[in-house]
Amino acid sequence: YKRQANAGSIPDELVDENLRTDINWIRRLTLSLDNAKAMLDALVIDDELSYNVADLSSKFNKKKFFDKEFYPISLFYLGMTTLKNSYRMVLPNLTMRSVYMDYYNQLNRIEGNAQRYVPTYERYDADRRLEPLVQNYFEQYLGQFPAQVFDKMNENFIRCSFYELVSRYLSSCYTFAIEQNNSVGRSDFEMTGIPGTDYYTDDRVVEFKYYRAKEAEKMLTLTEPLAEHIVQVKKYGEDTKRKFPNYHVRTY
């Protein structure tokens, strides 16, 4: 990093490869495939784990480290979760979220084959259209899941998995935020061009709406987004524009 800093450039990879080995602890902790899937569902779909405060200190027992009920505490002491409040733990940052999503994809046998995605991202370099990236995500990524999984999914899973996919190819061009706090609420997904790149001053704000199968028929009759959803995401974009007036902010 010193060499990169002195040269005035940004490294292609900012994630320490040693961090990837942390995911092996989930394999060791959970012991079985079913337990591992349940743990990952809680983190990447529900976005949290419940825990007992006493287990962090007064009742902590290293002999329970591999007990199913003790998983949240074990992950916390491994630095793989952080405390949200006195009841819930969450993932600490986007880097760890990406690591968990990568393992989730492995467990569910979701292909990461570059052939599925690279042509779309190459076109994005040329035309800067976000819509094909979303279409590619739905067809090539979500399209690999069996139908019964979709009723378990939610907006949190959509924004996390979309972030993981987009950041694979555009992390040298953009910084990313999930549930970005602003003066009018929390935007689902935002990508902001990095200064010094061709993407500087480019900002995209995305709001996801997930509907389960029983609501799909009603939603498929719509020819355009609902008015209240458009107003919502435009307010997020306006807030970003106030903070970064030199950026070209687009909302979706």
Regions found by a protein language model. Name each.
Residues 221-252:
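Nucleic-acid nuclease catalytic cores
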Residues 3-229:
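Extended alpha-helical interface modules used as scaffolds for assembling large macromolecular complexes
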